[in-house]
Amino acid sequence: MTHHIVIGAGLAGAAAAYSLTARGEDVTVLERHTPANDRGSSHGSARIFRYVYPDRLYTELVVRARELWDDLEAKSGTELITRTGAVDFGDARHTDLLAEIFEDVGVEHEVLDQARAAERWPQFAFDTEVLWHPDAGVIDAETTVRTMLERAVDTWRARIRTDWTVTEVARRSAGGFSVTSATGESVEGDRVIVAAGGWLPDLLGDLDLPEGFVDALPKFEVRQEQAFHMPYRDADADGRPSTPWPTFIHKSGEMFTYGLPGGRDAGFAGQKFAQFNGGKVIGSALEQDGQITDEMRTRMIDYAKRYLPGLVPEPYAETTCLFTNTPNEDFVIDEVDGLVIVSACSGHGAKFAPLLGEFAADLATGAGDVPDRFRVGAATT
C-alpha cells in the first residue's frame, strides 16, 4: 500500500488526508503547530461559502465542491456550512456578468434593484443593484478540519504528527521520500503532498523540486489580512441579530470588502468583515506579527458607518489571517515526480476544501487530473 506524507493540517491538508484514506491509502500528516491553528489560513469558525465568480470554471467547481460538502456532512453527522445566502454589489462587481454565469451553470439567484434590496436587507446601504443567491453560507473552518482528520484517523490509515516543523524533503535512492523535522526526526513515504499555505515560500528550497518546475511556479505573495467584528444593532440579549444577515461582497472602485456572520470566535454576536487583500505583504508565514493597525481599524469603522447601518461601528474580536496569493489569483495544484503541491489558494480556497482534497489525492495516486489552469505547466516536460 502506498504511504503518503501530507505537510500541513489546514483545510487543504486535512481534505487530502480524508480523501486518501477514504480510498484505502495510508497517510501521515505533519503539522508544524496544531491543526487549524490561528497562525495559518484555516482557523476560526467563519469562512464564506459562495458560488459567485466572474469565471465560469470556478462557479462550476463550487457546484462540485458542494456535493462533497454534503457527503462529508452526511457521513460525519456534523453541520459544517450554515446557510445564510449572499449578496454581491458595487460598481466593480458586474452583477450582470455574474448573473449570466449563474444562469448558464444553473445556480439559483435573483437580481434586485437598490430599492428592493434595501427593503429586503435594511441593514445594508447598497450603492448599486444587488445579486442574491440563497445557497451561500458560512463554513466552520476549524470544525471542518477536525472532522476530516477524525474521519481519516477512524479508518486506522492516518497518523497526525503535531509540533512537527519540516526542514527537508529528500528523495531516497531506493524511491520515495524522507521528510526531516527541526528536531531531527524523519518520516519516510512514497508520495508527498505539500499543503503548507503561507509557509510554502520558505519550504520551496527544501522540497527537492526539479529546477524547471521551480522556475515555472508563479510568484507567491503572502498577506497578513486584518478582519473585524462589529455588533448587530438589533441584537437580542445574547447578541444575536433579529434580522438575518447574509454574507456579502462589495466591490467598488474604492475598495473590495467581504463580510459574513461571525461564528464562535465572536460569540455569534457580530458581522465579520475585512478589506480583501488589504493587509500587509510579508515574506512568509514566519514573518506574521498578528498586529491590527489603527489605519485599517479606522478604515473599516468608516466603511461600516457608510454601508452597514445595521451594525454598531465598534470593533471587537479583531483577528488576522494569512492569504497566499498568485498574481492571477488562480490555485496552484500540480504534481512532479511524486510530489504534489496544493497551494496557493489566493484567499478563496476554503469553499473548495473537499474538492482540493480530491484533486490532491487524484494527483498523488494517478487516479485523475486537475484543471489545466492550476498546473504549473512548464515543469519538467
Residue ranges: model-predicted function:
Residues 167-187:
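Conserved beta-strand-loop-beta-strand element in the redox core of flavoprotein oxidoreductases
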Residues 21-41:
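Glycine-rich FAD pyrophosphate-binding loop
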